[in-house]
Amino acid sequence: MTIKFLSESTINRIAAGEVIERPASVVKELVENAVDASSTKINIILERAGKNLIIISDDGIGMTDKELEIAVERHTTSKLDESDFLKIHTFGFRGEALPSIAAISKMLITSKKRGTDKAFQIKLIGGNEKQITISVHNEGTKIEIRDLFFATPARLKFLRADKTELAVTVDIVKKIALAHPEISFSLTNDSKNLLKLKGQNKDAETNLKQRIIDVIGDDFIKNAAYIDFKILDFSICGYTSIPTYNRASSEDQFLFINNRPVKDKLLQVALRVAYQDYLARDRYPLCAIFLQIDPQFVDVNVHPAKAEVRFHDPNYVRNLLIEAIKNALANKSHVTSTTIASDTLKLFKNPLINKQPTINKEVNVNSKSVDYRSYSSANTPKILQNHICQKLIDTLPHAKVEQEVENRIEHKQQIHKQYKLGAAKAQLHTTYIISQTEDSIVITDQHAAHERLGYEKIKSYIKMDELIKQRLLIPEIVELPNEKRADCLYDHREKLSKLGLTLEKFGEKSIIVTEIPNILGDVNVQKLIQDLADHLSDFSENVALMELIEHVTETYACHYSIRAGRKLSADEMNALLRQMENTPFSGQCNHGRPTYIELKLKDIERLFGR
């Protein structure tokens, strides 16, 4: 077989295979072109999720007839020249999108250059038969794509159901819209409105906040920390959720480099590391984070789809992102998710709360049996109501309340006006602390809260190298389920020694413990070592010290904390609440669950129809 040149149409179809995978790819390329054209309004119309028809119209700078003819040729662009290849600020720069799309569809472009009198139209079928005619159009450009992949029918077999393809397109438009809150976007499919976003023209922070509310939701903003981080020519801004507001997947993580939406592993790992102290490993934060970096320090020309980037100094970027997120979270470290209280109140709601009892008009006064349920309290004389209530109260068994606790609480009536978590009023099921603030009640999980306090305390001791060892009077021998777990602990013995735990191997499946961290006090050594072995069984000997510290600290904190089922005095409960108010990230446990929920008085009153 001889070597020969490929035809232009074949080259374009091959290029389309790299750039255009599905209707969403077409929408992405054309919307990005519209953004680069300084548009303020971008409208997207689809039929069958774009399989039959895609129309993108904008009010950008438009094109002349000559520019229109050149635009559909390969490697033609207005966005790049040889001198600024390392300083790319625009979405597009390859000059491949239009000819690649034209090669596999029926394309019609209508455009009018700003400041000119005439509009022009060009029609292409499979990238051929170019026809330019005079047309009528407002300033800007409209591109119609029909019968996508008609020239490459094999690609149609790989398309998913309309619903799936549409979801991908909506996600792409949302990402671009987040990066450009100053632009209005609309998206319809089969005449159904899916997105309608109004362009914002206020200051940058307000614009971004409103666009995030429109795209991600108001709940996210209410439960997010604002990021504003700058160092030299590098800046990070946006919003990231507080730990108690999380998801089971990473779908709601929006990351941008110079306003370009990216899916970069380095940034995703940095995000994960920033939350590792506050979230369980199967939970993910929500975020919309924008990194601005000098274009010469980031390469966006890694893949035709431009979803991946390469940094000149990846570790520098990673560390700055972690620092920016942690700083933002520190400013919201005592806050718990606002949705928790509303979800809790829903559980209390009585489905019969709005149903008023009706009066039985056929009551026989001579009857010995009267159905009291048929009477409305509104029809009972007040004096009788009070009499009935008093009688009822007199028959109720009084709650057993320890006089000592009651007296102590009475002396602290004003605490709820001074402190965020209020004054302790009671302990529920020896597990939850009920406290009162000026306008709410707070329910605190004593174990989760104290575990968080312990975690932060132990972590600070480790950081300051102040973790004191306590020698056991009688060394403890701990037998583990198998030799693997015993070997795992023994392999990490030097690192564990730095964390206050001294141990040696004792037989095949046993470990002998001679020293433990002093802060753990009278801890159950058997349970501590078994839990540590469970945590570390999947770790290699070469695991990083910081990662080991995280897992060991979690285990220490769990054994350090007071347990559910322990009765606390009023002083102990109030002491715990005061510690929470003065400890960072006390609003969530080590797994991202809330340590307390706050129920506003007005919401409680609403439950009773007040």
Curated annotation (Swiss-Prot):
Q: Which UniProt keywords apply?
A: DNA damage, DNA repair
Q: Name one GO biological process term.
A: mismatch repair
Q: Can you cite an annotated GO cellular component?
A: mismatch repair complex
- Superkingdom of origin organism: Bacteria
What InterPro entries has UniProt attached to this entry?
Answer: DNA_mismatch_repair_CS, DNA_mismatch_repair_MutL, DNA_mismatch_S5_2-like, HATPase_C_sf, MutL/Mlh/PMS, MutL/Mlh/Pms-like, MutL_C, MutL_C_dimsub
Asked if the keyword DNA repair belongs to this entry, the reply reads: yes
Pfam families (UniProt xref) = DNA_mis_repair, HATPase_c_3, MutL_C
CDD domains referenced in this protein's UniProt entry, alphabetically: HATPase_MutL-MLH-PMS-like, MutL_Trans
PROSITE patterns tied to this protein = DNA_MISMATCH_REPAIR_1 (PS00058)
A GO MF annotation of the entry reads:
mismatched DNA binding
Role, per record? This protein is involved in the repair of mismatches in DNA. It is required for dam-dependent methyl-directed DNA mismatch repair. May act as a 'molecular matchmaker', a protein that promotes the formation of a stable complex between two or more DNA-binding proteins in an ATP-dependent manner without itself being part of a final effector complex.
Tell me the protein family, please.
Belongs to the DNA mismatch repair MutL/HexB family.
Protein name per Swiss-Prot or TrEMBL: DNA mismatch repair protein MutL
